[in-house]
Curated annotation (Swiss-Prot):
This is Imidazole glycerol phosphate synthase subunit HisF. Its EC number is 4.3.2.10. It comes from Escherichia coli O81 (strain ED1a). Gene3D superfamilies: Aldolase class I (3.20.20.70). The active site is at D11, D130.
Amino acid sequence: MLAKRIIPCLDVRDGQVVKGVQFRNHEIIGDIVPLAKRYAEEGADELVFYDITASSDGRVVDKSWVSRVAEVIDIPFCVAGGIKSLEDAGKILSFGADKISINSPALADPTLITRLADRFGVQCIVVGIDTWYDAETGKYHVNQYTGDESRTRVTQWETLDWVQEVQKRGAGEIVLNMMNQDGVRNGYDLEQLKKVREVCHVPLIASGGAGTMEHFLEAFRDADVDGALAASVFHKQIINIGELKAYLATQGVEIRIC
């Protein structure tokens, strides 16, 4: 069995790490490189960096910090933000990123997933999905351009359909960003994760809602996700990664202990 992964998420805007609640009202957390170094030293299995306004601004992720991060950490990291071409992806990978993640650009042009997978291999192509639960309809819908509140829009895709579509097109991994839970710290949306797990045959990463160590355990045990991504509990030092992994190990979760 592959070890489950603990993945701190660093949302980047204007060269700094920020964090919001339900993708709104972002506050500055700190500088990118020191935070990345701290999480690597604490025992993170991987890091994810989202340049949250790149797609909505019509630009690609600012690459200046990517190579600096690669110099100071020795764990894999994934970069996302406005990657719309093979050239964009190639540059970011050449600066030291291990994976690239696409979200809004994949919705705009789904063939991008296949072209990236064919060029660089499925193992380094992640598709992020920003999913919102509509209580009125009881359905999960995919959102686009979520880094900018004024430009966010609901797409025609229902989440389960898009999960299946991106796999057909070559996604090597899926990060499910559950917008209703984001930053609230009330736990991952286990119902949604279980439904997605049934149709997701590539590694599935849960994102949005972690507030306690038990929330991570539930995601691994009850929804069988491959990784759990979180931000605010790590940024605000509510949970220490090393202590979290030790706890999960005592609960029988296959995890890499640092």
